Amino acid sequence: MTVKKRDGDIEEFKESKIVRVIKLASSAVKIPIDDDLMTKLVKFVVSKVSKLEEPIEIEDIQNAVEDSLMKYNLYDIERAFHDKRVERSKIRFKAYQINKEMEEKLAASNIQNSNANMDESSHGGRKGEMINSYLKNEALDYRINQKFAKLHKNNHIYEHDLDSWALGMHNCLSIPFDDWMEDGIITRQVYIRPCRSVSTFTQLIAVGKQLQSLQQFGGVAATHIDTSAVPYIRYSLMKHYLVAWLKLTGEFNNLNLVQMAMDDYEEEDTGIWHNRLEDWIDDRKTQFLKETGLAYKDFYIGNEKLDSALYNSALYDTIREIKQSVEAMLHNLNSLQSRSGNQLPFSSINYGLETSEEGRLFTNAILHNTIKGVGNGMTSIFPCQIFQLKDGINTKPGDRNFDLFELAIRSSAKRMYPNYVNCDWSVQKVAFEKSQALKKKALDSIASEEFKMKVASLPWAIQDKLGFHFDKEEAVFKMNDYEQPFEASSTMGCRTWNGFDINFTEEYFLDLLKKTVETGKLPKNYLYSAIQKDGRGNICPSTIILPTYAMEAKKKAEKDGHPEYSVDYFMKALEKAIEDCKDELIERFNWICAQTVASASFMWENNAMKGYIPEEGIRSAMKHGTLAIGQIGMAETLQILLGCNQLDPRGMELAKRIEQLYKDKCNEYKEEYHLNFGVYYTPAESLCMTSYDKFLKKYKLIENVTAFKDSKTGELKPRGYFTNSIHVPVWEKISPFQKIDCESQLVGYSSAGCITYVEIGDNAEHNLKALMQLVLYAKAKDITYFAVNVPISECTNCGYNGHIKFDSCCPKCGAEDKYINHYARVTGYLSVKYQHFNRGKQFETKDREEHVQFWDDWVLSEEIVTNPHYNEVQMTA
């Protein structure tokens, strides 16, 4: 007899193989089979399969084996054989699914566009998607506790970035650029020297973001790029001033600059290479400083000690360098697809608080270049730009940086960037006060008078950076009432946020002081504040799919005969879901912390993540980051349970109850586990579609949940997506003030990141003061992070820039929609070509109502509009 194997090969039937599989099954249940019985079993199998057409199928042989065991009443052995058979079938089917998925990724035949920043059709995109598919299966089948894997598969709790779960990568990070600029950075191939000009500063910003993005799966941020740039703008000013001074010497006029620039030589003793022109300048720098009596500290904009002619020449060259450097930075961050071989790094920059002329010029250059556009005037997608709003600095006329705020508004109206972060957010203020109180308690606890005096004798700059100063007259430590730049509110673009660090303790601060006293300088691997943003990040997020729990609760309550208790059933289920989410995050956190330093050597060698102590492993740094418990579908959940969303007072009441539970549980876990659990309002780029699809498959079309009623036919049609986090649904016809009023009641519960945005029409550029009014109103309402969406379309055929509706032709040249870039905000970041969005995001983008349609005072004028909300804004701002 012949047998057809599963791979298609044909081979002779072998009785020995029947004996082997029966013995394996009997061994599994520890029931021996003697030789006589084994002979009978094999004989039965042979007689049964010999009647079949050759070649015999494997499944038929296995059926015969089961029949033989049942015939001789070997039920336990038959069950063991059957279970093993089912297990092997599942493995084979899983392998088939994986191979099928790999084929689809390789051929780009089933493009999902799960990430609008990735081209899944490209070589790099297909390669990346194939690897990601394998790693996701690895995570779900072998890495994650099967309880959590089941919750993920059944649409209860979503495990983000499963491919990175398998690898043990963390999410995102605010890079400590101040340290990198001062010390330089080490890469695998080269050491990059410290910056000594604004042009090298912006180059290192771009390079640093790209290098760090390869160590993680989320975004990278600069928390105060305008302040960070100041020292290097001053270096540039000094360099240009020196050159201007040298040009006045007769010697300069007789130089052969080309020959000197090309004349390099190697130093015999050290092997270091030098350049004759650079040597000539360096040799005369000492002479210059001696003759002029100047030092580095004298080179700042506005110093009247400097020679006016030389100063103006140097200032002109410095301003040009700033503008060109910023332009180059934007080009680099929009063009160098260094992430996974086919993506741009998800990068963000925060600015707006620096009041020095140098910092103001840098901010001005960012905004002017953003308005102008990159390349042939295209909107800059990266970095995500965040303007930091703070009373007394930039929120009203007379404030030092109010003019920059006005320019930011002009930029937002044209390019959507910058977004706006509220540096007076009530949650941030409470966290700052708590951090300062912790430090004060630690300082007051110092028992040794000798150590106390050593701390008191630290340089003012160090004390200031640590948030205190020693009052010599009163002989006491006093705490600063202002934040350091690395403490101020900033965000990592999409919305992620770092709040109060539970692991920045009094003991930690005292140890920091001890190390500082010993060395006379601040240790670079330590954190300096409990609310520090630099060197911290979101370690890992998970998201609870609220509509799933809501529908299950409603069904259970109805089944139990108590439909009026649906909300109570839901709240109980949600509490358990949050508990499960916490357990899963701890499992993932422990796996991340189990990775070696070699897995992200660039990050650890350069102290990118603060708090790293080699003897304690990478957990010493990871524990200062955030573990985020997220959510999706608040609006749909309220519809399921109450028949309304959060715009209705009943809906808002339940929404607050839900968020309070999130907040209470996260605070409880934070204290219990000494990990920074936080409430996260999930961006949900692909999840908005995948969670919806699974829900729809199970529960079908439900009005205002998975479907909307067609206004013409009255038929229910699929919506295509779930609403992100706690947002008011995009299809609601409300004014921007109503949307802000609604969401402002919920954002205060979030400690790990949130965003509020409004949709503005294509006349935003003609309503700048009205747009400013909206931003200030959001701030007055204690909105954390705010953005405006304006319709931006660019024709790649003729360069036309203006509002072009989806699926329309260019009004200037008639080019088809495929030649038109439609920009839209997807998760906090911008994306271009809505065709590259996943199906759910395409539906959501098209559903967005322009909120200004419902604001009667939105007019084509730059005059301040009369609005009942405006007085409130003015009073608050």
Where does each model-flagged region fall?
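Contiguous, well-ordered alpha-helical segments that form the cores/surfaces of helical PPI scaffolds
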Residues: 627-640, 660, 825
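Charged, amphipathic alpha-helical regulatory modules used
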Residues: 1-105, 109, 848
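Long insertion/accessory domains within large nucleic-acid-processing enzymes
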Residues: 811, 816-873
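Conserved catalytic cores of very large enzyme subunits
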Residues: 97-623, 644, 648-822
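Metallocofactor- and cofactor-centric catalytic cores in central/energy metabolism, strongly enriched
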Residues: 320-324, 640, 841-845
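Short, mixed-charge aromatic SLiMs
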Residues: 44-50, 69, 654-668, 845-858
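Short, hydrophobic beta-strand segments
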Residues: 44-50, 347-348, 636-640, 754-760
